[in-house]
Amino acid sequence: MGHLGFLVMIMVGVMASSVSGYGGGWINAHATFYGGGDASGTMGGACGYGNLYSQGYGTSTAALSTALFNNGLSCGSCFEIRCENDGKWCLPGSIVVTATNFCPPNNALANNNGGWCNPPLEHFDLAQPVFQRIAQYRAGIVPVSYRRVPCRRRGGIRFTINGHSYFNLVLITNVGGAGDVHSAAIKGSRTVWQAMSRNWGQNWQSNSYLNGQALSFKVTTSDGRTVVSFNAAPAGWSYGQTFAGGQFR
């Protein structure tokens, strides 16, 4: 990890406790699993996180159905899930997972017979190891209840700079609090703040020429809270590098 940017926290709008689902009741859904016993099949994914082990998410991850995925804006959000109302297959306790992928609909199958991720169903396709913490493998699919919870991360928000001159594609990972980045901005040491556009997943794009400048980042999550990481990347940064900034507390 590179230079740790100075953190400024700005509280905008509502607090984390009032994010959709925070502090509310449990919501009914269903869960299946994918990716194999080592979760190798969960790497990559529609959020753009790549290797989930090296990014710190591990096997506590989920692919979300259309109803939950929010066109990628739910990437990075955290859910507590427990198996419900199935004494044969459910195990006690709950899990907390991070949304890292999309479970696409299969309109060729009925919603109650294989089309688990079809709209309007709320469905979690869990990494197999974490599924087996709340249900037996042989169950295949189980009824669950879930709620949004704050994400707890170690270290700062991470910014991986990809692309090339005039096309800066920044992958934002390891976001605490609400976890789901809804807007981002970037500032070079010789520029003003510039809004970034979301390219896909949690890859955010700037078309400015920022080479040779220290980079600051502004990240806002769905609850309206913002973290500003000043000079997170030093002037000598290179494409492909990852730098750590501030963090939601």
UniProtKB/Swiss-Prot annotation:
GO terms for cellular component: extracellular region; membrane. It is found in: Secreted, Cell wall; Membrane. Gene3D superfamilies: Expansin, cellulose-binding-like domain, RlpA-like domain. Most highly expressed in the young leaf petiole and midrib, in trichomes and at the base of the pedicel. Residues 44-156 form the Expansin-like EG45 domain. Its main location: secreted. Residues 166-245 form the Expansin-like CBD domain. One of its GO terms (biological process) is anatomical structure morphogenesis. Disulfide bonds: none annotated. Coiled coil: none annotated. It comes from the Eukaryota. Keywords: Cell wall, Cell wall biogenesis/degradation, Membrane, Secreted, Signal. It holds the Pfam family DPBB_1. Residues 1-21 form the signal peptide. Causes loosening and extension of plant cell walls by disrupting non-covalent bonding between cellulose microfibrils and matrix glucans. No enzymatic activity has been found. Plays a major role in control of leaf growth and influences the mechanical breakage behavior of the pedicel. This is Expansin-A10. It comes from Arabidopsis thaliana (Mouse-ear cress). The gene is EXPA10.
